[in-house]
Amino acid sequence: MKRICVFAGSSAGNHPAFARETKALGEAFARNQIELVYGGAKSGLMGVLADSILAHQGKVTGIMPTRLFEKEIVHRGVTELIEVDSMHERKAKMSEMADAYIALPGGFGTFEELFETVSWAQIGIHQKPLALFNIEDYYTPLLELINHAIEAGFVPESNRSLIKEAKDPDRLLSELVKLG
């Protein structure tokens, strides 16, 4: 596994564990020589992860639409910055470059990227592993909702395996590498 796309919040959230564990994930990326592919911002958990990887001599590729350069405050210190025209192009490029996906805590944008990636896996557009970094049980309510959707007959039980989950950065990467 060479590259992992990470979806993450453009804010750091209100619990110190979000940033602390994101930094630890960055160290694990660098230690395992896995390149980060992400949205290209220097703010929030996106920036925390990129900075951690760069501080440990890892590689980071940011992908951002031109019109978001000011709003998301583009990270100009990344190894490679790819400028695209639209959010659709950003997501397509991130997916094209990635061998796997991780979702860190985040808001609507993170949820949208996560669910689009899961939907693509469900219909066979890709077979790349996907995992949630469940810091402070951030994603536990979402996992419960997914289980509820399975019980209600809206998601096939076999598709539950499309989303892995871990609370430890090394275990998270180990699971993805094993699946990839």
Where are these regions (language model features)?
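Short, positively charged, low-complexity/disordered linker segments
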Residues: 123-141
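Active-site/ligand-binding-proximal alpha/beta "capping" segment
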Residues: 91-123, 131
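Arginine/glycine-rich "motif VI" loop of SF2 helicases in the C-terminal RecA-like domain
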Residues: 54, 121-128, 154-155
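A cross-family phosphate/adenosyl-ligand binding-site feature
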Residues: 1-97, 135-180
